[in-house]
Amino acid sequence: MKFGKDFVRQMIPEWQQAYMDYAGLKSILQEIQTSRKRSERPGILKRKLSGSRNFSGLTKRYSRTASTREPEIQDILVHATTGDDGFERYETTILEVAEAGRESELAFFKTLDLEFDKVNHFYRSKVEEMVKEAVVLNKQMDALIAFRIKVERPSSSWSCSETVSVDMNALDSNDQRNTLAEEMGIRVEGNGSNGGDSTKESVPQVLSVLERIRLNKTQETPLSTIKNVLKLSNQEELKFTRENLKKIEERLKNVFIEFYRKLRHLKNYSFLNTLAISKIMKKYDKIASRSAAKPYMEMVDKSYLTSSDEINKLMLRVESTFVEHFAGLNRSKGMNLLRPKVKKEKHRITFSTGFFVGCTVSLVVALVMFIHARNIMGAVGHKVYMETMFPLYSLFAFVVLHMIMYASNIYFWKRYRVNYPFIFGFKEGTELGYRHVLLLSFGLGTLALCAVLINLDMEMDPNTNDYKTMTELLPMFILALVVAILFCPFNIFYRSSRVFFLMVVFRCIAAPLYKVNLPDFFLADQLTSQVQALRSLEFYICYYGWGDFKHRQNTCRSSDVYSTFYFIVAVIPYWSRFLQCVRRLIEENDSSQGYNALKYLLTVVAVCLRTAYSFNRGNIWKISAWVFSALATFYGTYWDIVFDWGLLHRPSKHLLREKLLVPHKAVYYVAIVLNIVLRMAWLQTVLDFNLSFLHRETMIALLAALEIIRRGIWNFFRLENEHLNNVGKFRAFKSVPLPFNYNEEEDRDS
C-alpha cells in the first residue's frame, strides 16, 4: 500500500483537518517535476552533441547532484520565530532556486511551513489539555486513596489533630517506586523498624481530602431527572461502603482507559505527521535534485512535535498507576484493558453469511414457484390467509429489510470513514460489522421463509389437516425464539450489542426522564419507520391471545381494546421523539429542537387522523387526514434534507454543503429526490390508491418496506452530517464522567 493511502487510513477521522496535507504537497511536487521536464527538453540535443567532449573531460563541470558535492552545502535555511500567541512558527528560505519550477518550489515550502505550524500548534494545544486532565485525574486518585483507606479501616477513628501512621502496603506496592501516592505529591515517610522498607504516611493529611468532595451521580435515573427539574442537589453524601468503593473504582478505571486512549492517539498523531514530512521531503530531494530533507528534518526533530516527551511520560504514569490500582499488579491484564481491542474478521462469519444469503434467495424462488404452481392466490380461503397469516409473517420481512439496510449503512460508513462506533458510543471492539448484521438478518430470513413454505405446504396437503393448529403456531414459535435470543442473559449471540439495544429501547420508552443522546433519538427515528411492524406485534397478541388462531379468523378489528391500541402503538415512536425534543429544548435551550418537536407533533396528529379514517370512511376524516399528512410530509422532508443532512445551504457550492464525504455529487441529488418520492408514498393510504392485482395487506406491506428503505438512505447522510460536525470541532473522544466532585473554593483555600 502506498504511503498516501496508508496515511489517510491511519488518521483519526475527527482530526483529519489537523494532519499534514500530504496529498496537497504531493500535487505541488508534481508541478515542480512537470516544470523541470519542460525546461530540460530544449537541452536534450545539446547534451547529446557534447557527450564525447564530456567524456574527454574538456567540458567537465560539477553539478549539484554529483558525487563530489560538498556535504556542508545546504539548499535551505529554516528560521524559527515565536508568535504573539507564544507558539513557534517556522519559515524556510531556499538559498538557490532554479528558474524552472521556481514558483512551485517557493509555494511548496510555504505550504509545508504552514502545514507544519498547524500540526505543531495542534499537537501542543492537545498536550496541554492532556496535562491539565492529568492534574484532574491526580485529584480523583487522591480522593480514591482516601476513600479506600476509610473503607479498608472503618473501625479506626482519625482526627486532624492526630498523627497516626498507616502501613500503605495494604493498598500500594513496594515493588513499584513510582507509586500513585508519590506521583500526586503525597508525603511518604519510612519509619518502620525495617530500615524504612515499609511505606508509611500521615493519614490525617490524606483523609482531609474527603472533607472537600462529593460523589457525582454518573448514571442518570428518572429520580435524578426529577431532582434536576426541582433544582435539588444531584450529588450524594459520602458513604464509605465497599459497594461504593467498587463503583468508584470501576468509574475511574473507565476514565483511565479513555485517557490512555487519548494519549495513544496523540502519540500516533505525532509519529504519522513526522513520517509524512520525512516522506514528502525525500520526494522533494529526488524531484528537485537537492539535499533539503536533512536540514528540514533536523528542524522537525528540535520542534515541540518530536522533542516533547510529555505524552510518553504520561503514558508510563498511567500504565504504572492502572496496573497497580486497577489490575491487581498484573501488568498483562492491565495492558490488555488499556490497549485498544483489534477486532478480527473471522472467515466463518463470511462463510455463514454467504450460506444464509444463498438459502434466502433459494427459498424466495421456491416460494414464488410454489405459489404459482399451486395457484394459491386463486384458491379458496386465500383472502382469509392474507388477513391473518400474512401480517404475522410480514413482521419478519420488515425486520430483515431494516437489518439489511443497516448493514449497508455500516459498509458505506466504513468505506467513507464515518466513525460510527464513536458516534453511537459502542464499547471499543464490540461494534457489529456489516457481515455480522447480514448474518443475523439472512439467518432470520431463512428461518421465516422455511416456516412460510412449511405452512403453505401443510395448508395444501389434505393429509396434514390434523396438524392445522401446529401450522398456525409456526410464526409464534419463531417470534418466541427471536425474543428469547434478544433477552438471553448468556454471553452468546453478540450479548453486548443486545444489551446496548435493549438499554436504548428502554431510554426511548422512558423519554423524557433520561438525557437524550444520539443513539436514543436515532433508534426512536428508526422505530417511526417500523409502525407497521409494531402493529403486527399488536396483531400477534390479539390473534394468539384471544384464540383466533384455532379457527383462523380475525376478530381483532371488532374489539374496542384492539382499536384503541391500534392508535397508541402507531403513535408511540413519534411521541417518544416529541418528548426527546422537548427535553433537549429545555436542557440545551436550542430553539431548533422546538421546531423539531412541532414536526413530530404534526405527525402524531396525522397518524391519528389517518387511523381514524381507516376505521370511519368519511369525507371529513379524509380531508383532515389528507391536510395534516401533507403538512407533516412537507415539513418532514424539508427537515430531513436541510437539518438532518445539512444540505441545500445557499452559501455552499452546488447547493449542498461545504464538505462532502461521497466524491460524486450526483449521489446527494439522487438521495434528495428519492427522499421526496418515498415521503410522498406515505400519503398513499389517505388517497386510497389501490392496485387491482394486489391485496390490501400486500399494498400496506410494500409501502412499509418503502419507508424502511427511505430510512436506510436517511441513516447514511444523517451520520455523515454528524461525523462532519465532529470533524469541525475535532471531537474524537467521548466524555467520561468523574466519580468525585471537588469543592473548588475549599480546595483553593487548602
Swiss-Prot record:
Cytoplasmic face residues: 1-350, 413-435, 494-622, 688-750
Lineage: superkingdom: Eukaryota
Domain EXS: from-to ranges: 557-750
A biological-process GO annotation: phosphate ion transport
Pfam families found in the cross-reference section: EXS (PF03124), SPX (PF03105)
UniProt keyword annotation of Ribosomal protein present: no
Tissue occurrence: Expressed in root tips, vascular cylinders of roots and filaments, leaf hydathodes, stem, receptacle and stigma apex.
Location(s) in or outside the cell: Cell membrane
Topological domains annotated Extracellular: 372-391, 457-472, 644-666
Transmembrane segments: 351-371, 392-412, 436-456, 473-493, 623-643, 667-687
Topological category with respect to the lipid bilayer: Multi-pass membrane protein
One cellular component term from this protein's GO annotations in UniProt: plasma membrane
Keywords: Cell membrane, Membrane, Phosphate transport, Transmembrane, Transmembrane helix, Transport
Main location (coarse class): membrane
Induction field: Not induced by Pi deficiency.
Domain SPX per the UniProt entry, residue ranges: 1-298
Function: May transport inorganic phosphate (Pi).
Protein family (similarity comment): Belongs to the SYG1 (TC 2.A.94) family.
Protein name, as recorded: Phosphate transporter PHO1 homolog 7
